[in-house]
Amino acid sequence: MISNLEIKNYKSINQMELNCSRINVFIGEPNSGKSNILEALDLSFLSWMMHINEVNKKVNTELIDLKSFFRVNKVADMFHLGNFNSPISITHPGFSAGTNIEYIQDKEKDINLFEFNNSNGSFTNFDSDFIPQDPLQFYATPIKPYRYKSNIQFHDTGNYIQRLMAPFGNNLAKVIYHNTDMQQLAKEFAKEHGFDLNIDNANDNITLQLRINEGIVYSLSYEALADTYKRILFYSAAVKHTNARVITLDEPDTHAFPPYVSYLAEEITKQKEVQFFIATHNPYLLNSLIENSPADQLSVFVVSYDRLNRTTVTKKLSDNDLSELLDFGVDIFFNLNRYSNDSIEYPS
């Protein structure tokens, strides 16, 4: 487990140190830098995502748009205030090799490159568009990001089978097919709406079917399914069926019906062997995690942007703060200033 995390020179973060728990939740106003904290951890998976793309090119399957994933137009946008003089550095002593990204000049080829390297001495060079350069070297990591996409191309390139493929879960159909708990979850949701679940294992496809009469079946493709349904399947698989030791989830509660948000929170608390880093704006998710997590296994950080020092900062809530949220029903999302700088704000 990551006990201590240090991030330097990444996007809005100049320098940040966090004392982490098994479940780490980041809350704060939009554009405060919550997602940047998750992305900093995701950088350790960057080399492997490049590997996934190289494999997918050969079999003509969906590529990961790395610019979109990291929300940049070019690699240079990842450096804090465009500072190339210092590398991007993510360290977590005692857990796994740290990650560095630094700017380098290839004088022989007269091109500017970036080098992904870790404390084990491994490296991958790539250009400003995230295109890896020879020699191609890629490295796996125990940290995996999971990000929901409404429309994905199902495939199991890499033969993950029972474990959900990061970052988008392209093998979700296989995961449901090979795990009875996922089958049950999918079937129950379909049954509530009068449909039957159909998994086409040969073609990696998910549909819901409604029997009209003998020999007549109406089918709904995965793309046409309700967003809440697709999200709960994806995030349930990510939480329960991963080989990662650490996973990051960015607003897994978006567009989700409150009972499903509470269900997801309960599943997160049950996975004792996995560490979570989660950004959220959802009081249902936050309160469910506080209610169901032992105090020593949960950390909640209020994230804000320090305009004076031009950096994202965090404040970890105390046990008393968390008790107050539950005991008095305080909606922290209307009182963020109270917990970050002791002032109180109310909704208008």
Q: Each predicted region: which residue ranges?
A:
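Switch/communication elements of ASCE P-loop NTPase nucleotide-binding domains
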Residues: 1-50, 216-348
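Phosphate-coordinating catalytic segments in nucleotide- and nucleic-acid-processing enzymes
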Residues: 46-246, 306-348
